[in-house]
Amino acid sequence: MKFLDETKVYIRSGDGGAGAVSFRREKFIEFGGPDGGDGGRGGDVWVEAVNGLNTLIDFRYQQHFKAKTGTHGMGRNRTGAKGADVTLKVPVGTQIFEEDSETLIVDMVAEGQRYRLAAGGNGGFGNAHFKSSTNQAPNWANPGLEGEEKTIWLRLKLIADAGLVGLPNAGKSTFLAACTRARPKIANYPFTTLHPNLGVATVDEKEFIIADIPGLIEGAHEGVGIGDRFLGHVERTRVLLHLVSAQEEDVAKAYKTVKHELEAYGGGLEEKPQIVALSQIDVLDEAELKAKSKALGKACGTPPLLISAVTNKGMTETLRALRSVIDAAKAGEEDA
């Protein structure tokens, strides 16, 4: 499936139906008076957050959404039916912006959340509304009001409990594949991952969601490479797992590069709890492992976890560490 995390769409709610001009016509009643009904209200445009979606790709093929016009009023004081609504189904985590792409309309953060983006126009009054002591037989009615139209931006920020960050080839996709059922593309060259992947990890019978984003390189916050575009997807996570490849010549420099990019990007990423791990340790002998572990620990201020997704070494301990931070964060949110 292709990944799309930002798109522009045009929406228009339905016009209101016109009121009817009608007069009561019955046997033996010569002057029946007006009985034109009101027009129906136009359909609304809604947005709804649903599970099972993790991309906005459907909006690449349909970018115009228009609700139906309300039915016109009819004689015998019959009101027209409301026009059919239109609902845009989006992944949980989608933000809706005005056309300027900066003014937030609504943040769809929960499954089943609905929001009305555009209300349908009111139906026009039928001529029965205009009967008065001075005009017993009005022969006019109101047209329905026009619906609203606007252009909006949809921007997806995936919702996950933990986010994987690191340089390209740090082993993030391999880690995700090893601890979840996700099947990201894996190869031994930089930028194999071109879009975020989500997976559900289980440890001690507890599940949590992990997001893997494309690797960051120096200058990412300024648009170098592709990782900066996807940093928004880890803004909502509760903890970051920072993977540093054991194949790096200078593990301290690799750590500091990503740390600097997170700080420069902003969005609160630099303040998030972070677990640092030295990955791909199966490629090192014992002396090299000890030296690189010490260098990385000195750079980040705490001994790193040591993991290999190939041999499964340290994987359970890492998942437990992530789960512990996530549980603590959830408890803090509930207390607040």
Curated annotation (Swiss-Prot):
<keyword id="KW-0479">Metal-binding</keyword>
<dbReference type="GO" id="GO:0000287">
    <property type="term" value="F:magnesium ion binding"/>
</dbReference>
<feature type="domain" description="Obg">
    <location>
        <begin position="1"/>
        <end position="159"/>
    </location>
</feature>
<feature type="binding site">
    <location>
        <begin position="308"/>
        <end position="310"/>
    </location>
    <ligand>
        <name>GTP</name>
    </ligand>
</feature>
<protein>
    <recommendedName>
        <fullName>GTPase Obg</fullName>
        <ecNumber>3.6.5.-</ecNumber>
    </recommendedName>
</protein>
<feature type="domain" description="OBG-type G">
    <location>
        <begin position="160"/>
        <end position="327"/>
    </location>
</feature>
<dbReference type="InterPro" id="IPR006074">
    <property type="entry name" value="GTP1-OBG_CS"/>
</dbReference>
<dbReference type="Pfam" id="PF01018">
    <property type="entry name" value="GTP1_OBG"/>
</dbReference>
<keyword id="KW-0460">Magnesium</keyword>
<feature type="binding site">
    <location>
        <begin position="191"/>
        <end position="195"/>
    </location>
    <ligand>
        <name>GTP</name>
    </ligand>
</feature>
<dbReference type="InterPro" id="IPR045086">
    <property type="entry name" value="OBG_GTPase"/>
</dbReference>
<keyword id="KW-0378">Hydrolase</keyword>
<comment type="subunit">
    <text>Monomer.</text>
</comment>
<keyword id="KW-0547">Nucleotide-binding</keyword>
<dbReference type="GO" id="GO:0005525">
    <property type="term" value="F:GTP binding"/>
</dbReference>
<comment type="function">
    <text>An essential GTPase which binds GTP, GDP and possibly (p)ppGpp with moderate affinity, with high nucleotide exchange rates and a fairly low GTP hydrolysis rate. Plays a role in control of the cell cycle, stress response, ribosome biogenesis and in those bacteria that undergo differentiation, in morphogenesis control.</text>
</comment>
<dbReference type="InterPro" id="IPR036726">
    <property type="entry name" value="GTP1_OBG_dom_sf"/>
</dbReference>
<feature type="binding site">
    <location>
        <begin position="279"/>
        <end position="282"/>
    </location>
    <ligand>
        <name>GTP</name>
    </ligand>
</feature>
<dbReference type="InterPro" id="IPR006073">
    <property type="entry name" value="GTP-bd"/>
</dbReference>
<feature type="binding site">
    <location>
        <begin position="212"/>
        <end position="215"/>
    </location>
    <ligand>
        <name>GTP</name>
    </ligand>
</feature>
<dbReference type="Pfam" id="PF01926">
    <property type="entry name" value="MMR_HSR1"/>
</dbReference>
<feature type="binding site">
    <location>
        <begin position="166"/>
        <end position="173"/>
    </location>
    <ligand>
        <name>GTP</name>
    </ligand>
</feature>
<dbReference type="InterPro" id="IPR006169">
    <property type="entry name" value="GTP1_OBG_dom"/>
</dbReference>
<feature type="binding site">
    <location>
        <position position="173"/>
    </location>
    <ligand>
        <name>Mg(2+)</name>
    </ligand>
</feature>
<keyword id="KW-0342">GTP-binding</keyword>
<dbReference type="InterPro" id="IPR014100">
    <property type="entry name" value="GTP-bd_Obg/CgtA"/>
</dbReference>
<dbReference type="InterPro" id="IPR031167">
    <property type="entry name" value="G_OBG"/>
</dbReference>
<keyword id="KW-0963">Cytoplasm</keyword>
<dbReference type="GO" id="GO:0005737">
    <property type="term" value="C:cytoplasm"/>
</dbReference>
<comment type="similarity">
    <text>Belongs to the TRAFAC class OBG-HflX-like GTPase superfamily. OBG GTPase family.</text>
</comment>
<dbReference type="InterPro" id="IPR027417">
    <property type="entry name" value="P-loop_NTPase"/>
</dbReference>
<dbReference type="GO" id="GO:0003924">
    <property type="term" value="F:GTPase activity"/>
</dbReference>
<feature type="binding site">
    <location>
        <position position="193"/>
    </location>
    <ligand>
        <name>Mg(2+)</name>
    </ligand>
</feature>
<dbReference type="GO" id="GO:0042254">
    <property type="term" value="P:ribosome biogenesis"/>
</dbReference>
